[in-house]
């Protein structure tokens, strides 16, 4: 029997750009043809949609809670209008949020809009070292609050107890779905969820130590209208639709090849991106560093970077990546918000200038940076391809002249990610 999906099965709302790509990557790996929209799609996009899953990328992680809720509800309405059967709210595997939210408030609003009384919250991503045990989030062997995330310039995470963190962001009761229930399998999880619901719990942090735990959670939650978490929680969702006879049998990861120049743009200050920049510099490949203080002083940094790129024979790295200490020093002078905006805007302008000079393949490091770059390039829709590193797929833009992009969350990717991503975007091996 041939399965024809006139409408998407799974609708996803992500609170940042690279998080959306991370989730889309997971769904493609599971066999779902997936597209990612930058913001809520237009009517024109909706008319031509051919996907099993749609991921809407918002920029709602660090905005005011009221704004994040309004944007998320608008995205939910669009997804429901397309006929999506289940909704997934995606946030970072390190539970990135400000003291004011926004994970709890958005989850609460989505639950209410869907008329549901319960959902899970599980940011675990074991493949990338993010695990949850007794409600506490670990990054590799470190508690979240000791992992380096406590120094994040926008969303410092100083508490690893996710039940406590989430409860501070919502009026709804928060509980814990512990590892011992999950280890007993799908029916035990369903039974424990029923108990939690009976106790009035509306949001439950779910432990997860392995991918097997995530598959168990996915299967147990097949009938929940809403799921929330990191991309790892989506591991088991494609199989739910396949088991129900709703998923098409096709190569979900196929992408067209894109010819043209290439560049690496890095704005993240994370440990992983710092290591990736160091690897590039150690290989003595051409690189240009953006100085936020020079930007603030009105110097022609964008023009200088573009001139540098034009003069080089090989692929260049243009980066604002710095150590946490350097970032804090700049923020003391400029303020965190202004410093971030200056760098994002500059990298966006540089990306646009490079595109105009023939660059067609972009490797971008950092969630905020990726958002600025896709906006500057006027990318509205991405086809999602094969994985480069855990959480990071190759993508190609739809509409207009195609661009190949690898949009990486700051903390993702191995030390050799830049060269590996360039190789995959070019259609070969790094």
Curated annotation (Swiss-Prot):
Catalyzed reactions per annotation: 3-dehydro-L-erythronate + ATP = 3-dehydro-4-O-phospho-L-erythronate + ADP + H(+); 3-dehydro-D-erythronate + ATP = 3-dehydro-4-O-phospho-D-erythronate + ADP + H(+)
EC class (word): transferase
Residues the entry annotates as binding ATP: 268, 366-369, 410
Keywords of the record: ATP-binding, Carbohydrate metabolism, Kinase, Nucleotide-binding, Transferase
Gene3D superfamilies: Four-carbon acid sugar kinase, nucleotide binding domain, Putative sugar-binding, N-terminal domain
One Gene Ontology molecular-function label: ATP binding
Pfam families given in the database record: NBD_C (PF17042), SBD_N (PF07005)
Presence of the UniProt keyword Ubl conjugation in the record: no
EC number: 2.7.1.217
Role noted for this protein: Catalyzes the ATP-dependent phosphorylation of 3-oxo-tetronate to 3-oxo-tetronate 4-phosphate.
Similarity-based family: Belongs to the four-carbon acid sugar kinase family.
Protein name: 3-oxo-tetronate kinase
The gene coding this protein: otnK
